[in-house]
């Protein structure tokens, strides 16, 4: 037997005649490791408890962030595992056999981003653990002991990387005979909170993040859950009355901002969090029964229930109920905890990006930030339609996927147009002209391809071929026309969540894009997943989303994925992933609206993992002014302009109709001017759900842009221009709410002020309820 001394610099070899005695001694050893951040503010301790369970805790400036929390994985007994029905968990009876500490410091340049340079500076603790598991033979079961009890060693590594603003941990599984293939029943990573924190959370759901963020104490999550869920969403799978999604933003009573998320989620299921509260009897294991209700009576685990205010990881299952199929060598995503006593640090953190691998693409010259408009908003509102005809209750497409189809195939050339189809030649040319006139790069066109007549919520596998246009969409002519104007069309591939169908047609669809000069695609995954029974955030679907990004890169195509899994920083490794939706975007302003504080929360939560294609820029907020839709956007025009800065993305849409922007052409000037890529970003003030103010310096220029957005209470700010170059003067244009502006009663009231300013001056600004401001500072 080998027992390592506490510091693991040396070891003692001991021989025991009585192996039972040596086994009993193992959990009594003092085994611990510790690592601090480069500036010393963040401290992480690791040890095994009396049962040999891996345990960690975390502090910030000596204040508790994560109380002692256990780590481990429950594995499934299954014929597909290397150990088969003899499989055992990776939860306890571990011994620390090695501990390595190191420090790493680099500066790297993203292809696009909020800053030109990103520093990646951390200290690392890598702990190697060994576990012995036993196989009990029939002889043992009859009472004999000794040679019938066999032990098999398994080795795992738990790696901690500690930054000045938080830490990441992950499990690593070296290749080994006794742990080759294994199936995850559940990951049991704990995050024990030090109090009843205020939290900004979304209901834990395997299929959607398109919910409104809730703000409650941790102890109030259970009571709020039922009303927090948007049960009418096209795909809902809520798993627990205390389950929440990441990124989870919290604030302690003593003023610490704490965020739990994950980084580099690849070949693994998306992680949710299940809160243990005073009413918790057992942790949920998997979704059962209907597809939109949480498990009513979960069964107790063999392991002790954590204390109240502890979050426990909960992975998204596949159609079998399992959480992951793993082959060593492999690792989990990073589990991240960010912390600071300044809310601005939450927004400026690069921890998630830094925990991802460097860029995997040799050539990135074709990847670029994009500002675009599109044939989209009028369909969302209901003014136009995606489908070309209303003649048929359902359709079947012909082609390679349907060689033996006997059903009558729709002849679109003879079908009666419904007169509302948005993606028609005349309208698309109008958008191209608008983009060219106003310096926009691309025009998104949705509903261009056949199949939209019965596309949604039917669990229909063969719904689109992504290649055949409707009769009134001349794909060759329109691309030629766009290119003649210096504009490109932006492709749309709605999959209707049929991943099987998309993968079957993807190569030909990308070839078509290359043929006509498209360089970006917006993908969509509306509805329940096909293969049936799977979920949007399962291991297999996460692999699908990444497969799309990788295949697109081979064709020099950028990807903007909607309804896909929430981002975890993979855009560093694959920078052609330029956007995701993965939250409640502007489209919901046509579905009842979102609260004014919504966009003051998203940068603290959803945007932690990567940029969001929020599609801002709605100027005519009362939709009934131009359609039959009675919904309305809870924002002012000045607030809409602010979103181009506070909601960072290299892909920004001017989402409203061209004619609406023409009504407010002076305000639209800011959208013309604002870049989508930056050399520097400075968060000037921030508080979750209340307000955000940020200044950004345009990539490769001396120009600065400042945006401020607030909630329904309004906000006043004093803006010090200390970030400007002291040797320059700037032409300053301020787009602000008018004194009587209000998101509900007077959203289109704004004032534009122009002046010359220099560093050191101060601007005083008042943001209306639901409003904001935007400023351009052009170096003279």
Question: Where are the model-predicted features located?
Answer:
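Hydrophobic h-region of N-terminal signal peptides that target proteins for export
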Residues: 23-32
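N-terminal accessory beta-strand-rich subdomains and adjacent acidic, glycine-rich linkers
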Residues: 34-363
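An acidic-aromatic substrate-binding cleft motif
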Residues: 327-430, 438, 442
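Catalytic domains of carbohydrate-active enzymes, especially glycoside hydrolases
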Residues: 427-448, 513-519
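Aromatic- and carboxylate-enriched substrate-binding clefts and catalytic-loop regions
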Residues: 446-636
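Catalytic cores of secreted or luminal carbohydrate-active enzymes
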Residues: 638-685
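Carbohydrate-binding surface patches
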Residues: 688-730, 773-776
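C-terminal beta-strand-rich structural cap/linker in extracellular carbohydrate-active enzymes
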Residues: 754-780
